[in-house]
């Protein structure tokens, strides 16, 4: 069952869902909570690796990812990160989100931004039960013009669903959880699969 706005507010009040800093009621509507863009970004360096073999040895994948990913870029409040057409970048939500073992979250992009070519998550939009941390955004500009992205702009919306029961293996209890408690724009850790 998807949670409505009053259920979301109740879960926030009870501490079952934690969003820090807590959004005001003006950012909770219908079935979702608007989330804001954080200050941390990562981009791909051009021409630093000929390819990444996604089924190759883990050490080779890790080395290739380290070569192609930039260090984290911090954009101060009020300044902009420019995402150019055809560019993929990682960013992070301003808020940190914590979910219990019986709720799954879903991140949706904003239609107004998509109409300008901005994809907020290339594929990964599920927020696992037991998740705690900031949410990494996989931006892609499919439009014709560069897009200026500013920290604390509305970037997406989270909605939540109750599971039929608590997950037996929530994210925070899994030993192999690659992105547990992430706070920045963490690069791919596919080599840890």
UniProtKB/Swiss-Prot annotation:
Pathway: Pyrimidine metabolism; dUMP biosynthesis; dUMP from dCTP (dUTP route): step 1/2. GO terms for biological process: dUMP biosynthetic process; dUTP biosynthetic process; nucleobase-containing small molecule interconversion. DCTP binds at residues 110-115, 128, 136-138, 171, 178, 182. Keywords: Hydrolase, Nucleotide metabolism, Nucleotide-binding. The active site is at 138 (proton donor/acceptor). Its EC number is 3.5.4.13. InterPro entries: dCTP_deaminase, dUTPase-like_sf, dUTPase_trimeric. GO terms for molecular function: dCTP deaminase activity; nucleotide binding. It catalyses: dCTP + H2O + H(+) = dUTP + NH4(+). Homotrimer. Catalyzes the deamination of dCTP to dUTP. Belongs to the dCTP deaminase family. NCBIfam families: dCTP_deam. This is dCTP deaminase. It comes from Aeromonas salmonicida (strain A449).
């Amino acid at each position: 069952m998807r949670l409505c706005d009053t259920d979301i507010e109740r879960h926030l009040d009870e501490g079952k869902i934690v969003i820090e800093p807590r959004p005001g009621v003006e950012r909770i509507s219908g079935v979702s909570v608007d989330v804001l863009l954080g200050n941390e970004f990562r981009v791909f360096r051009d021409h630093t690796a000929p390819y990444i073999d996604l089924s190759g040895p883990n050490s080779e994948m890790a080395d290739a990812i380290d070569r192609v990913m930039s260090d984290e870029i911090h954009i101060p409040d009020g300044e902009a990160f420019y995402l150019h057409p055809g560019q993929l970048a990682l960013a992070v939500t301003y808020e940190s989100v914590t979910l219990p073992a019986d709720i799954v979250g879903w991140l949706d992009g904003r239609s107004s931004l998509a109409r300008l070519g901005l994809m907020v998550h290339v594929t990964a939009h599920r927020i696992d039960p037991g998740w705690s941390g900031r949410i990494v955004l996989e931006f892609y500009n499919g439009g014709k013009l560069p897009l200026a992205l500013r920290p604390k702009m509305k970037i997406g919306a989270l909605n939540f669903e109750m599971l039929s029961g608590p997950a037996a293996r929530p994210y925070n209890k899994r030993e192999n959880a690659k992105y547990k408690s992430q706070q920045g724009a963490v690069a791919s850790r596919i080599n840890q699969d």
